[in-house]
Amino acid sequence: MNTPIPNQIIREITPLSDKDCFYIAERYKTEFTYPIHNHSEFELNFTEKAAGVRRVVGDSSEVIGDYDLVLITGKDLEHVWEQNECRSKEIREITIQFSSDLFFKSFINKNQFDSIRRMLDKAQKGLCFPMSAILKIYPMLDTLASEKQGFYAVIKFMTILYELSLFEEEARTLSSSSFAKIDVHSDSRRVQKVQEDINLHYQEEIR
């Protein structure tokens, strides 16, 4: 008799280097396969043409539309994007991961960063931005994915965070806590995926 597979949350080791301000990955895919996971880095995740995908953040579970933008700063907050009923073969995903050290205390506590500080704090439970915010930052996000490196890329990324912080009151908190542990459903794409395969492909598929 086989022992039931326990609920597992992968602790992801991200590609973010200590010498980089952020790590950005742009992918075009036909499906989401990476299992439920968490990591110590902050994450901003954008999806396009992914209507029908189920987004799980902590104890929040929602089916998303064509566009979705979420910020997660909870270091133990598990999350996953599940294929669910999505039929699109042209999914675009842009993931930006960055360390909390990017904003050292003497910097983030300045008055000019009030809105960013509040947003990062609120995002410990996951923060979903409205379409108006997505439209505001889309041109910058679109070009940042191709730039990736250099001083001006960092400035553009910080500008994106600032612009999003102006939508803090409109953005929705997702999870009821920053450390909610949900039950893992019997989704074969997640539960039966072996650790060796995860380690082999994690740089191509962050989720």
Please give the residue ranges for each predicted region.
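Amphipathic alpha-helical segments within well-ordered protein domains
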Residues: 141-145
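A hydrophobic/aromatic-rich effector-binding and dimerization subdomain
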Residues: 2-16, 76-140, 169-171
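Short beta-strand-to-loop capping motifs
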Residues: 48, 98-100, 146
